C-alpha cells in the first residue's frame, strides 16, 4: 500500500469515528448520488463547470425551462395584465391576496431561473463550438455575446470580416482579434446536425433573454402599483426582489431594518475558492443603484440608511397610503441630502498664528570666568572660515570618500579684498576741523621730513631732487628762520612798542 492510500484510509476511519457519514458507509444513500441532502442544510448542487455537455445530443434535454408549463403560464398572465391596466383604488385588503401581486413575485423568481438556464445553454454551446473555433471562448467571455457570435459565424469563419451584424455585438478591437485568430485556428468543420443543434440552442438562449427583459419591464411598471413608495427609493427591480424574499409586503413591513438589509445575502462559498470577494452582511439593498453610486467606504453606511427608509416606505405601502408616492419622494430626498452631506469636503482649517514661545529664565551670568569659558568653547577663526561658503561658487570636496565635506574659505586663495570689521559711523570718534588743520600743519615740512621735526624713523632723508641741480641737500630749518625773522617784528616776545620809543627819542 502506498503512502497516499494509507492517508486516504486514515481519513476514512476518522470520518466514520466523527459521524461524518450517517446512515451507512460512504456513498450510500436512499436516492441518487447527486440528490443526497444533509440534515438541516442545503441540497448539494453540482457545479455548472463540472458538467460536460459535449456528448449531449440536444439542448432541450438539459434546458427544460423554455418549454415548461409554469414558464408559459407566467408569460401569458403577464401579457394579460399588460393589456389591462388597473387603478390603485382597485386594491383593497392585504396586498398578498391580490393575484397580480402573486404574479409579480412569481415572475421575479422566474428571472433567477432564466439566468441559470442561460448559463447551462452557454456551456452547451461552448462545448459544441469548441470543435470549430476553440479560441473564441477566451476572446469573447460574455455569455450572450458568445452565443450571438456563434449564431452569426456558424461554420464560415470568414464572416467576421466586414460584418455589420457582428459590429453591433462586439467592439472593433475584439472583431479584429477574432478575425486574426480565426485565420490560424486548428478547428474542424461542424456537421449539419451539429450546426442545427447549435442554432437551436442559440435561438433558445436569445428567446429566454428576451423573456427576461419583458419580465423586468412588467415588474418595473407594476411595482408602482403594488408598492409605489418602496419602488421610488430603491427601484422597481430591487423592490420586487426584497418583497419576494421576505414573503410579501406585509411580512416586509413587519421586518426590522437590520434584517431587511440582509435580504439576498450570499452565504455559500465554493470549495477551493477564495471568500475575500464575498462581502458579508450585504444583500439586495447594498447592490442597488442608489448605494452603488457612492464611494466604497460609504456604501455600508448608506445601505443601513436606505434599509431604514425602506422599512418606513413598506409600512406605508402595506396600508395603501400615499398611493401617489409622496412619502417615497420625501424619504428619497432625505437620503440624497445625507449622501451629499457625507461627501462634502471638510471645512478649511483656519490659519492661526503660532503662540508666543514660553521662554524659561535665561542665564545672565557674567564676569571674567564666564568670558573665558565662552572663548574656550566658541568657534575659532579657522572654524569660522571653514564654515563660510562663497556665494555662486562650486565647492571642492576635501576628501574623496566624504562627498559634500569642504573646507569653505579656509583653503582658498584670497580675492585681494581684506575682510574688515564694519565701522559704525554713528559711534565713530570725530575730530574738529581746527584740530585737523593743526595736525596737518605739524605734518607739513619743506623739502621733506627730518628726524628733528618728525617722529618718524631715522631713515628719513632731507635730500631733495630738483630739476636744476639734481640732488640737493636742503636745510629744512632755513626756510623757517626766514619766516621767524619776518614775524619777529610784530609777534616776537622781545619786540618793543615803537610809538613809545619814538616819543622818548623826541623828548631827548
Swiss-Prot record:
Q: Where is the composition biased (Acidic residues)?
A: 7-32
Could you tell me which Pfam families the record lists for this protein?
Nop (PF01798), Prp31_C (PF09785)
UniProt short sequence motif Nuclear localization signal (NLS), positions renumbered to this chain: 362-375
GO MF, any single term: U4atac snRNA binding
What positions are marked as the site Interaction with U4 snRNA and U4atac snRNA? 281, 304, 309
- What pairs make up the disulfide bonds? none
Please provide the record's keywords in A-Z order. Coiled coil, mRNA processing, mRNA splicing, Nucleus, Ribonucleoprotein, RNA-binding, Spliceosome
Which cellular component terms (GO) are annotated to the entry? Cajal body; MLL1 complex; nuclear speck; nucleus; precatalytic spliceosome; spliceosomal tri-snRNP complex; U2-type precatalytic spliceosome; U4 snRNP
Which spans of this chain does the record mark as coiled coil?
A: 96-131, 192-226
User: Which Gene3D superfamilies does the UniProt record give?
Assistant: 1.10.287.4070, Nop domain (1.10.246.90)
GO terms classed as biological process: mRNA splicing, via spliceosome; regulation of alternative mRNA splicing, via spliceosome; retina development in camera-type eye; spliceosomal tri-snRNP complex assembly
Q: What is its main location?
A: nucleus
Q: Where is this site: Interaction with U4atac snRNA?
A: 300
Boundaries of every Nop domain copy: 226-344
Cellular localization per UniProt:
Nucleus; Nucleus speckle; Nucleus, Cajal body
InterPro entries this protein is in?
Nop_C (IPR042239), Nop_dom (IPR002687), Nop_dom_sf (IPR036070), NOSIC (IPR012976), Prp31 (IPR027105), Prp31_C (IPR019175)
In the record, the note on similarity to other proteins reads:
Belongs to the PRP31 family.
Subunit text: Identified in the spliceosome B complex. Component of the U4/U6-U5 tri-snRNP complex. Component of some MLL1/MLL complex.
Can you quote the domain comment? Interacts with the snRNP via the Nop domain.
Functional description taken from the UniProt entry: Involved in pre-mRNA splicing as component of the spliceosome. Required for the assembly of the U4/U5/U6 tri-snRNP complex, one of the building blocks of the spliceosome.
Name of the molecule in the record: U4/U6 small nuclear ribonucleoprotein Prp31
